Amino acid sequence: MNNNINNPLTDVFQKEGTSSIIGGNTPFLLDDPDAVWYVRSGQVEIFSVNVREHHQTGARYHFFTAQAGDILLGIDLEKTSMEIGFLAVGLIDTEIYKISSGRFRELAENPGNISYAAKLLDKWIEGLSYGISKDINTHTDLLIEPVDEMEVEDGNIIRSKKGVAWTSYAEGNTLFIGMEEVGIEGAKALVPVTQDTWLQTIGRTRLSVVNTEVPLTNGDIWQGLVDFHKLLFQCEFMNIRLAEVDEFNRLKTKADYETTAREEALSQLVSVLQCEGAQETFSGDHADKLFMSAWEVCHAMGISIKAPPKSKNTNVNSVSSATAAIV
């Protein structure tokens, strides 16, 4: 059972939020930055999808599963500028509650709610982190935990020892899951890493590590989440494009195989039905394997067949032409 169900913040969702019963026939995009959803019962499957004008296009790629007690954050897709978003699809009779992100932020920053809000946000970050890294993995050089400052040599792979660890940099930079630089020159980088995701240092790097409660207390977490979502979509954009290329190659290989198999089958049919002493040969436009196969079958049955006249229509059905030529 998810411990977040006993989180006092979730009571506010149920008292103040708008309730909805969702299922597989009511998917919705998490593209409203002014909304936060709480999963009261059931579960919600989260997919990454291409988005055009606030509508899903193309295939769905499963990201992670949100359980009862979890929250879902709306994301401003204009700030990510990648034409990618998250689609939420509930199991039948899943119950969710929605409140405004402003109200959630107000509740989360209340000193008495910091630890509870941190648990809710950690579950969201861990779900996204699992989704972006579930198909790739690498070794780990160093497990990190909260510390004022630490130095890591160039090229090291670091992960969180436990839970969500937020990293910030005094020197150097890192690659998120080996794909995207996390730092922006002249800007403060605050990046979460979990046991599923990793950071690879670029040059000698000095960084500090804190848990989620620290940026929640000072308010830095909200911009950190915006940057994290953008970082995820940059990586997922590449993942989706690679998946589309793989699917194209799979279909092309399948089509090539079917063509080869069909040609081999026709060749085998001709070779099996060839009669010793048959002298008639075919050339030019009539030397196709389908007509040759038809001729061999008819010859064995004592039926005469002649090649059909060449059609001006290049799309003429060759099966119809062959059968029409039986006399």
Residue ranges and their predicted role:
Residues 1-327:
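Cytosolic regulatory regions built on CNB/CRP/Popeye-like sensor folds
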